[in-house]
């Protein structure tokens, strides 16, 4: 792995913080907005954006790159996975690109993790791929964004397994039970399975949260699966936010039925398009979604160090 230090730049500094104050958070969010307008996509995930305002979170650090005191770049590092290397996302202000700031942030992340690092490149742009190569990172994971039209929604009415009923989420009442089912359903997927009450509260506080689009499947009064939908109002885009089924309830068509229920809900909201994210190596899920009319829209790439 060749990761020569970036050339020094006059006035450039990288500051590492465990939490951001309100002014720093606003500056970072403004930078992210400018980058999203320029790039056509977010450089930092929803979870990462929630952490910017969320104060101190165990295992999370923020890297602010400034030039003559002005914010020019940002990175977030999460070190909560007991097995995998710390994961990072980074972005440079569109007006500050081409000056080695991305490489400087990458070098700071490598130094902070002892050169044991994973980095997301949302959208997999050529610039992001080049930076990964410069930092000595190798492609590790491919996350696909799939989309399909909801006009018309040419899906049959969902058929639930025998004994299963569906209702909508009740905030407060269902929190603990849903978190337990989410942990069990995503025991193999720490990014989703490790969600806490604080993570759930953060999402419930977001303007997009609507319990009418959060469906719970029950058998004998116990939650056995769910489909949480999300509406991106500005883009008029519906999302299959997360679908989960308890391991013991899998294999009977519940996941497909829940997905269909959510898509019918999004179509009833007069949304023209639905989207979802799925790992490319989850071939079974990719096949199911493709049979439901989804096709690949774009790809997020994760790179990691060899060590």
Curated annotation (Swiss-Prot):
Catalytic activity: 1D-myo-inositol 2-(L-cysteinylamino)-2-deoxy-alpha-D-glucopyranoside + acetyl-CoA = mycothiol + CoA + H(+)
Signal sequence bounds: none
GO molecular function annotation: mycothiol synthase activity
UniProt: acetyl-CoA 1 binding residues: 90-92
Residues annotated for 1D-myo-inositol 2-(L-cysteinylamino)-2-deoxy-alpha-D-glucopyranoside binding in this entry: 46, 191, 230, 239, 277
UniProt-listed HAMAP family: MshD
Name this polypeptide is given: Mycothiol acetyltransferase
High-level lineage: Bacteria, Bacillati, Actinomycetota, Actinomycetes, Kitasatosporales
Gene: mshD
């Amino acid at each position: 792995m060749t990761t020569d230090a970036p050339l020094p730049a006059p006035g450039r500094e990288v500051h590492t913080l465990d939490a951001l104050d309100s002014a720093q958070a606003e500056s970072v969010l403004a930078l992210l907005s400018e980058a999203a307008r320029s790039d056509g996509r977010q450089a930092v995930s929803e979870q990462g954006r929630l952490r910017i305002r969320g104060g101190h979170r165990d295992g999370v650090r923020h890297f602010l790159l400034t030039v003559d005191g002005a914010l020019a770049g940002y990175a977030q590092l999460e070190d909560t996975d007991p097995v995998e290397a710390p994961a990072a996302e980074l972005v440079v202000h569109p007006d500050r690109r081409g000056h080695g700031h991305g490489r400087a942030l990458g070098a700071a992340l490598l130094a902070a993790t002892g050169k044991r690092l994973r980095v997301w490149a949302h959208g997999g742009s050529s610039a992001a791929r080049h930076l990964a190569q410069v930092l000595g990172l190798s492609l590790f994971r491919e996350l696909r964004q799939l989309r399909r039209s909801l006009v018309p929604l040419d899906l049959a009415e969902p058929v639930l397994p025998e004994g299963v009923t569906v209702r909508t989420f009740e905030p407060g009442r269902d929190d603990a039970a849903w978190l337990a089912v989410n942990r069990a359903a995503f025991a193999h997927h720490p990014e989703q399975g490790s969600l806490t009450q604080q993570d759930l509260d953060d999402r419930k506080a977001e303007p997009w949260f609507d319990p009418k689009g959060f469906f719970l499947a029950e058998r004998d009064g116990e939650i056995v699966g769910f489909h949480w939908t999300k509406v991106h109002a500005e883009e008029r885009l519906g999302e299959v936010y997360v679908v989960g089924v308890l391991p013991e309830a899998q294999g009977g068509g519940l996941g497909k039925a829940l997905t269909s229920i959510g898509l019918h809900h999004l179509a009833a909201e007069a949304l023209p398009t639905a989207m979802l994210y799925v790992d490319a190596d989850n071939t079974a899920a990719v096949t199911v979604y493709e049979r439901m009319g989804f096709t690949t829209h774009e790809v997020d790439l994760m790179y990691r160090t060899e060590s």
